[in-house]
Every structure is written in C-alpha cells, then in structure tokens.
Amino acid sequence: MPGLLSDILAWVVIGTFVAGAVANGRDRELGRRVMTAAWVLFALFWLQLIPHFTLVHKSYIEGLLTIAAVPASLYAGWLLYNGRDTLFVLSRAVAAMGVVYLPFETIPAFTLLGATVPAPRGVLMETVAAQTRFLIESLGYTPQMIVGDQGYLNTFLWMQGSHRLEISVVLACTGLGSIAIFAGLIAAVDAPMGRKLRGLAIAVPIIYALNLLRTTFIAISVGKQYFHLFVDEVLFLFGSSDPYMVSFFISDRIISQALAVVALVGVTYLVVHEVPELLTVIEDVLYMVTGDEYDLRNELGLD
C-alpha cells in the first residue's frame, strides 16, 4: 500500500464491515446500513489506490481492476441498501479477507517483554524468498541473496556484465492476497465446518505452490533477461526508460498476471465443488456485471 493513511483507511473500512457483520446478527436493518457505509468507504479506498497501481506500480490489469472496483463497490452498497440480502455474504467475506490480510500489511516489528517480535510481512516475504531461492538453485542458477530496501533478506542479486539487477520478493509476491480472498469467502458462507476446511485445504496449498512457481519464473526471467523483446514498444507501453525492466514487464505484468487470472478461475472451480455456497457470491458478482440472475448450482449440477 502507498502509506500510513492508506493503511489507516483500510483498517477503518474493514472495521466497518466487521461492525456491520456483528450488527446484522442482532438487527438486520442496522447491519444493512452499516455495511452500506462500509461499501462507500471501500470505494474511497480503491479510489485513492488508482494512482499507485496505474502510475507507480505500472500494472494495467491491477490498474483496471482498481478503477472498476470504485463503481462496483458503490453499486454493491446500493444493491444491499435496496434489499439484495445475498450481498451480506460478500460483505462478510470482505471483512474476513481484511482480517487475514491487513495484519501482514500493517503490523511492524515490536518488542514485547524484552523479546523482539518480527513483522509478519517480513517473516512471510523472507520465507517465500528462501523457498524461491531453493527452486532457482534447483534449476541451476545461483543469484546472490541480499538484504533488500525494506531491510529483509528477500532480494536476489543478478549481474548482467557490470550491471546489477535486484529482484525483491515483496508482500504482493507471496500469494497472501489470493489466499485472503478464498479464506474470506469460505469463512463468510453458511456451510458445515468440515467442508469449509476441505475448501481451504484445496485453495491454500495450490495458490501457495503456484505463487512459488511464479516468483521463480519472474526472478529467473528478469535476472537472465530472457524476455528482452520488443524493447521500445514495451518501454512505451509501461512508461519506462530502463531497458533492463522489459523482461520484468513481460514476465510479471503480462504473462504472470494473465496466468494468475486463469489460475484463480481454476481454483474457484475446484473449491466450489466442496463449498457450493460460494456460488452465491459469484452469482451476485455476475448480476452486478450483467444485470441478469443466474442459478450456477443448477448449471454446474451441484444441487
């Protein structure tokens, strides 16, 4: 995230969703009003992230999704306020996603009773970086592992002649975001705990393993400059002047992000066979996009 104010806003948004979920259990109409307010705040949250993803992060896919999230959040709040009660499930899911993700994003290292407790993000990033290093070295490559800009041992140093190429495993490279999405969705639906746990047992290992393949692919592709192709066109497309970034843009921003969408669809297909209640959320999203009602349980033969 861009900074402290963004982190604070994120906690306010998630806190409002959690408050709405609690209120909904006691007074449905109060819960509806609180969750509607949460969706408006969620739209503001995505709005302030647009410059980060489009101008700083230079990700077309994430940038477009962030832009789309603003009206989508407002529309979800409007539908919920006007009686589409199935959106209570999606609202609870957003609350649970935030509870899973934000501690890693925002909690710093601290000292407790004389013992230093490391930042959760640092532990996760260093763990993923170490496992990525194992895969890279298993393929015969030997980049040096160094401490990155954030102070964690999460960065690979490659040399192209006399030019240093540093590729860091940041929080967005850990798979946590996708894991939080599925954890939130599964936690939010009304289903037996056994099936929920089976759904998590499917989603989490697959996402984590695929993410390790992704970080390995990107680190090698950038370190060895395997996608140094269409240099002028790619630099123009992403607004950059560094030719060494071309392999990164192609391997990460184009190939990996496109494959990530396909992977998420595949994981969703597997999970809904264990937790078909998730289809309620998918049906709501499809309704928001198309304006048509769907019965996915019947279409997928999951009744």
Swiss-Prot record:
Membrane protein topology class: Multi-pass membrane protein
UniProt site (Transition state stabilizer): R253
Outcome (variant: R253A): Retains some processing activity but does not complement deletion mutant
Ranges annotated as spanning the membrane: 3-23, 36-56, 60-80, 93-113, 169-189, 200-220, 259-279
Record flagged with keyword Cell membrane: yes
Annotated signal sequence range: none
GO biological process: proteolysis
Effect seen on changing C173 to A/S: Lack of processing activity
Active site: C173 (acyl-thioester intermediate), R214 (proton donor)
Location(s) in or outside the cell: Cell membrane
This protein's record includes keyword Transport: no
Disruption of the gene: reported phenotype: Deletion of the gene results in poor growth, especially under low-salt conditions, alterations in cell shape and in the S-layer, impaired motility and impaired conjugation.
Enzyme class: hydrolase
Functional description taken from the UniProt entry: Transpeptidase that recognizes and modifies its substrate by proteolytic cleavage of a sorting signal. Following cleavage, a covalent intermediate is formed via a thioester bond between the archaeosortase and its substrate, which is then transferred and covalently attached to the cell membrane. This sortase recognizes a tripartite structure consisting of a conserved Pro-Gly-Phe (PGF) motif, followed by a transmembrane alpha helix domain and a cluster of basic residues, usually at the C-terminus of target proteins.
Similarity comment text for this entry: Belongs to the exosortase/archaeosortase family. Archaeosortase A subfamily.
Official protein name in the record: Archaeosortase A
Naturally occurring in which organism (per UniProt): Haloferax volcanii (strain ATCC 29605 / DSM 3757 / JCM 8879 / NBRC 14742 / NCIMB 2012 / VKM B-1768 / DS2)
